């Protein structure tokens, strides 16, 4: 049974749209936990477009589940992670022009530099996950980097047309099995919604799904606690048959 990590970046997006103080993502994280979130995920971007350093400091002091820090593989971010001591760091690719993360890390091309950062964080007691596309080459490179976890990028599945979703789901299933055969633990996320999450949640071996935008969008209608509860039910009790095919 997969657990649910709730990404609260989009709450901070609303605040930053007006450059004001509300909504504050810190108390919203508490509401997400009260709704059943097993962890809180935030992405501290280099341009600070949504989550701010102040948010991260306060979240570390207040989150009672698990705090997963998504960040670019840079010296600045490694220094912040070493200071904050999140429960996990997920290294993600980052481009200033993108609206959201557009793909997985090219671990195979950056294996040398990533290994140094992975070692530095894990020696300090912080488990490291690498956000990767569901491709064997990247999984093998992730293993060689010394990371203990991968987070599979589910964007291709989430964005696929009806006819292609079964193919993308098979890729995720195969990638999960391959990662586990290497000794890696597996999370997944990106683009998952109330409509498409169950098939991914049913994949044996995926331990946690990180989901944000759809929960925050749903919360406008039903409130954050209820939106998290609804997603938690789908993640923990998925239909075993996909809605397509």
UniProtKB/Swiss-Prot annotation:
It catalyses: 3-amino-2-oxopropyl phosphate + 1-deoxy-D-xylulose 5-phosphate = pyridoxine 5'-phosphate + phosphate + 2 H2O + H(+). One of its GO terms (biological process) is pyridoxine biosynthetic process. GO terms for molecular function: pyridoxine 5'-phosphate synthase activity. CDD domains: PNPsynthase. The keyword Cytoplasm applies. It is found in: Cytoplasm. Keywords: Cytoplasm, Pyridoxine biosynthesis, Transferase. Its EC number is 2.6.99.2. The record marks 151 as: Transition state stabilizer. Belongs to the PNP synthase family. Homooctamer; tetramer of dimers. Catalyzes the complicated ring closure reaction between the two acyclic compounds 1-deoxy-D-xylulose-5-phosphate (DXP) and 3-amino-2-oxopropyl phosphate (1-amino-acetone-3-phosphate or AAP) to form pyridoxine 5'-phosphate (PNP) and inorganic phosphate. This is Pyridoxine 5'-phosphate synthase. The lineage of its organism: Bacteria, Bacillati, Cyanobacteriota, Cyanophyceae, Synechococcales.
